[in-house]
Amino acid sequence: VGSEMCIRDSPMPTFVGKRINKVLFFRNRLALLSGENVILSRPGTLGTPDFFIESALTVSASDPIDISAASMFPSDIFDGIEINAGLLVFSTNQQFLLSTDDTVLNPDTAKLRSVSTVNYNKDIPPISLGTTISYLDNSGKFSRLNEMANTSREGEPDVVEISKLVPTLLPKNLDLLTN
């Protein structure tokens, strides 16, 4: 959604014609996860989301953000959860952090970088445990419960398999994780 002038002069958002895997809300913007991209609307447009730039000549802090996950693996993004450092998003084999080093998140300052390469069960959303995030990995014979801590804009987070002591406790076909 956007004005006729903006739509005509703007590139189409990357989600057009593609499946949207998840809809989130992050920093006063509607966030869409589609393919390997995280697409954020213009801020404050939740009622009528606007994914088109204001001007093709300049970049504004209020422009939408459309950023792709750079990876050596196929990395379709299926889910995300807000943490202090930014928006942590999950593909089936990698996790990425959408963040900024600046105080304002805008198209010029947004970064989407890989923070870990742990398998993730795309059918069950990650959950917040306060200062950590837990999520399931069902890539083996049984599911594994992982906990991610100390996720920051720099460096790698600590990822611990907290179900390691009971490796056969969680069946592969779990369909719910809650805190």
Where are the regions that the model predicts?
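Beta-sheet-dominated scaffold domains
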Residues: 37, 69-179
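Beta-strand-rich domains and repeat architectures in extracellular enzymes and scaffolds
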Residues: 13-36, 74-79
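Beta-propeller domains
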Residues: 33-62, 99-104
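Short, small-residue-biased leader/transition segments that mark boundaries at the very start
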Residues: 2-7
